[in-house]
UniProtKB/Swiss-Prot annotation:
InterPro entries: Ribosomal_uS4, Ribosomal_uS4_bac-type, Ribosomal_uS4_N, S4_RNA-bd, S4_RNA-bd_sf. Keywords: Ribonucleoprotein, Ribosomal protein, RNA-binding, rRNA-binding. GO terms for biological process: ribosomal small subunit biogenesis; translation. One of its GO terms (cellular component) is small ribosomal subunit. Residues 31-56 are annotated as: Disordered. It comes from the Bacteria. The keyword RNA-binding applies. Residues 97-157 form the S4 RNA-binding domain. Signal peptide: none annotated. Belongs to the universal ribosomal protein uS4 family. This is Small ribosomal subunit protein uS4. One of the primary rRNA binding proteins, it binds directly to 16S rRNA where it nucleates assembly of the body of the 30S subunit. With S5 and S12 plays an important role in translational accuracy.
Length: 207
């Protein structure tokens, strides 16, 4: 399955929630109407969605939120299922500790997609070593830094400036002057997207 390259706001409308696929420079309210499904007039409400339909929709929502394709998403779920603890929460934590997401959370990218692109272009180091793998798992104590040659990139500077205004998660510490951040700890469930029902995803893969 190829990566979706169409209008990002359309995906948020389809899921009925902000998937944070667009920059926070504009509020989502000005970008699309979440209560209106894609289509010229929006899809009319029909019969009640089945349990399977709800489970599938939740999986699609999380995949789109993190920009993950099906095969890779299944691998993340399998890894989460192998670990001790709540499988759904572990799945979200694995996704949150991806390097492209951490770059986004630290404010170096305005969206996860931009963070992924910057990582692939070798704009960052992790503990002093250049890493260009978006799925690289960041660990507590790791230092993610913008490379010297990338520090003047307008999109990074603007994204960081905006992030400073909005605020960053408590589980990262960012030095804006040095343009580097420390991954302090794996976020608790309460610090991850609230508008996700991960138990539905667990139910789907447990069928």
């Amino acid at each position: 399955m190829a990566r979706y390259i169409g209008p990002k706001a359309k995906l948020s409308r389809r899921e009925g929630t902000d998937l944070f696929l667009k920059s926070a420079r504009r509020s989502l309210d000005s970008k699309c109407k979440l209560d209106s499904k894609p289509g010229q007039h929006g899809r009319t409400s029909g019969a009640r969605t089945s349990d399977y339909g709800n489970q599938l929709r939740e999986k699609q929502k999380v995949k789109r939120m993190y920009g993950i394709l099906e095969r890779q998403f299944r691998r993340y779920f399998a890894e989460a299922d192998r670990r001790k603890g709540n499988t759904g929460e572990t799945l979200l934590k694995l996704l949150e500790t991806r390097l492209d997401n951490v770059v986004y959370r630290m404010g170096f990218g305005s969206t996860r997609a931009e963070g992924r692109q910057l990582v692939s272009h070798k704009a960052f180091t992790v503990n002093g070593i250049v890493v260009n793998i978006a799925s690289y798992q960041v660990k507590p104590g790791d230092i993610v830094a913008v490379r010297e040659k990338s520090k003047k990139q307008v999109r990074i500077v603007e994204a960081l400036s905006l992030a400073e205004q909005i605020g960053m998660p408590s589980w990262v510490a960012v030095d804006s002057k040095k343009m580097e951040g420390t991954f302090k700890s794996v976020p608790d469930r309460s610090e991850i997207a609230a508008d996700v029902n991960e138990s539905l995803i667990v139910e789907l893969y447990s069928r």
